[in-house]
């Protein structure tokens, strides 16, 4: 029996659970994931194999890095690119305004996940409830942002 951690680049359109199931079938090992990515998200999903599944609490609590793309002037009903546009237009902030604002996001704070998130409410993914017309209530959780860096800007 092999044990270890596989960092899988999960494609959009696949749930974290589906990714784990595929890896488990390919390896023949017990598998679990350390954290959940929303189905439409693309990103690294740490998959624990065999005896390494016991390390979940240690791996899941480690610091993570994200690369985000922001589109100013568009709002969707799901708060992500998968939703329907509910508003558009308005003033787009200058690069300097964005750079000046970044430090205000640093540190520890409480964050309430959006209704269309992979968080669970009574054992059901919030995005499933929201798609069925329910309004899931998600409890805020503590987040900590250690660093923010502007990488690039594209004007469309």
Feature roles, as predicted:
Residues 1-156:
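Catalytic/RNA-binding core of pseudouridine synthases
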């Amino acid at each position: 029996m092999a044990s270890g951690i596989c960092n899988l680049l999960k494609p959009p359109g696949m749930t974290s659970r589906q990714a784990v199931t595929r890896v488990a079938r390919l390896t023949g090992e017990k598998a679990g994931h350390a954290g959940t990515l929303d189905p439409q998200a693309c990103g690294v999903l740490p998959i624990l194999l065999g005896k390494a599944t016991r390390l979940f609490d240690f791996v899941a609590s480690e610091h993570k890095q994200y690369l985000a793309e922001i589109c100013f002037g568009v709002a969707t009903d799901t708060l992500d690119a998968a939703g329907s546009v509910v508003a558009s237009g308005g003033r787009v902030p200058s690069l300097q305004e964005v750079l000046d604002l970044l430090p205000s996001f640093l540190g520890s704070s409480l964050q309430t996940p959006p209704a269309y998130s992979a968080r669970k409410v009574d054992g059901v993914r919030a995005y499933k409830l929201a798609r069925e017309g329910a309004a899931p209530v998600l409890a805020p959780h503590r987040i900590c942002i250690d660093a923010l860096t502007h990488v690039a800007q594209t004007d469309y």
